[in-house]
Amino acid sequence: MKAVKMKEIREMSREEKLRKLRELELELLKLRTLVRSGGAVENPGRINLIRKDIARLKMALCEEGYRV
């Protein structure tokens, strides 16, 4: 999966951004749990990509005046 671009994020509605944010946070939680339980992650760089996407979404929501 590729990174979500700011242009794409700004075109989303607030509900879409919040849904995507919850989706990514859940995926990050699952990956972190897998790593901590001793499992091997298929793509370790995916964790950093998800973290950056979450930050982009939160920044876009803050720009709209929505507190996350």
UniProtKB/Swiss-Prot annotation:
One of its GO terms (molecular function) is structural constituent of ribosome. The keyword Ribosomal protein applies. It comes from the Archaea. One of its GO terms (biological process) is translation. Pfam families: Ribosomal_L29. Disulfide bonds: none annotated. Transmembrane segments: none annotated. The keyword Ribonucleoprotein applies. InterPro entries: Ribosomal_uL29, Ribosomal_uL29_CS, Ribosomal_uL29_sf. GO terms for cellular component: ribonucleoprotein complex; ribosome. Coiled coil: none annotated. Keywords: Ribonucleoprotein, Ribosomal protein. Signal peptide: none annotated. PROSITE patterns: RIBOSOMAL_L29 (PS00579). NCBIfam families: L29. Belongs to the universal ribosomal protein uL29 family. This is Large ribosomal subunit protein uL29. The gene is rpl29.
